[in-house]
Amino acid sequence: MPIPTLAEKLAWLKPSPATPYEKHCAAKVPQGDYEIGVQVTNDILDEAMEVFIRSSRSYFGVSGDSMVALFTAGGDLINASCGTYLHAIIQPIVIKFILKYYEKNPGIRDGDIWYTNDALYGGIHNPDQVALMPVFHKGQLLAWASAALHTTETGAIEPGGMPVSAKSRFEEGLNLPPIKIGENFEIRNDFLEFYSVYGLRAPAMFISDLRARCTTADRVRVRVLELVEKRGPGFVVGLMRKMCETAEAGALKKIKALPDGKFRAVVFNDAIGWTPALVRACFLTLTKSGSRITFNFEGTSPENPSSYNVHPQAVVGHIANFMYEYIFHDLPIASSTFAPIDFEFPEGIILNPDKMAATSCCVFIGMQCRNATHNAFAKMMFSSAALWRQVTAAPGSQHTSQICAGHSQWNLAVSDVLSFSLNTQGQGARSSQDGMDAYGFAWCAFGRAPDSE
């Protein structure tokens, strides 16, 4: 069973080297056409996000706590429309896994629909599920499209997808490695039947959100092919490669402007699941040198027999939430922005547990990694006369998920999380400015608050 190793995952986070064909195509894209092309990808993804919101059933789907993304043929992220940045940097792991292990059997073909939610293979936790579609033009693989969303039911030992009492992955319900769930642009009925068994507490919502992901990814595919028909495949390939290079150059410039040094931050949890416990949820040593940053988590507490463990790429996802909201706020959402950033995870810590570990409540530990990152960058930036005014306090843990299960007023089965209470939480203050009482969600800066009544 080729579960990707930590080394593979961290390598797949980085952009792949440009192929000779990509370099040739990128050199032919004029600057004016490049700027227009970038905006076209923005429009494609924003339209697909609107489709996603309107076709989803779960609260998080309707709220826009989701992401729609476009990738190169090799799996590198080049742009996205985000309610949340949580999935932004890590989805290339899934695509590159498919390319490495499944290219020949079962094969990658036009009209395929791939699906996954397993954190062992590059996800966050099993409620966060993603549909992916390859974009082919006359037999040539040009790109990939994806749609990711948290669906609050997985058939676990508790309703709501994040069982607090789970002690291993075998109590968390659906954990699906990357699998082909559709061919010839149709979802397979046998998979829908298999999938719905895990969503028996709320089957209509479960299946509706799956279909919403698939139709959203397909909308991106269709619009990209329209651009190909208008400008040619070479232009699209060159545009995406140039977007990768431009994003990386911007990230290098921003990182280089930060002060060099070592900056530490430690964040504790006072409980693990139902058990009071003092846990060093994140011990971060952040080293900034020139145009590179290294995150080292030596000193973090060991993994524990609960669902409060985090696989390494999920930690990176939480860090991406901070980076894109604050440091890279004006850069494209692209794999190449993380090219100058390295991660070191000691084996056996709560942020790099055994493959059997439960991780369904990983977000509550992952958020502490985001808070530690926030605090470390605050120390770094506060030492700079040019940057100290931009320092913002971390949003805190925001551990107030309200999960419910039962029957709606229409007597339909429901298992969901009430997103309106999450998407209206507070944001930290600056040194010269108050915080915000109702800013958004620490995991989703742009989510809505529907059905608050």
Task: Give the positions of each predicted feature.
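Glycine/proline-enriched, intrinsically flexible loops and inter-domain linkers
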Residues: 2-110, 115-137, 141-453
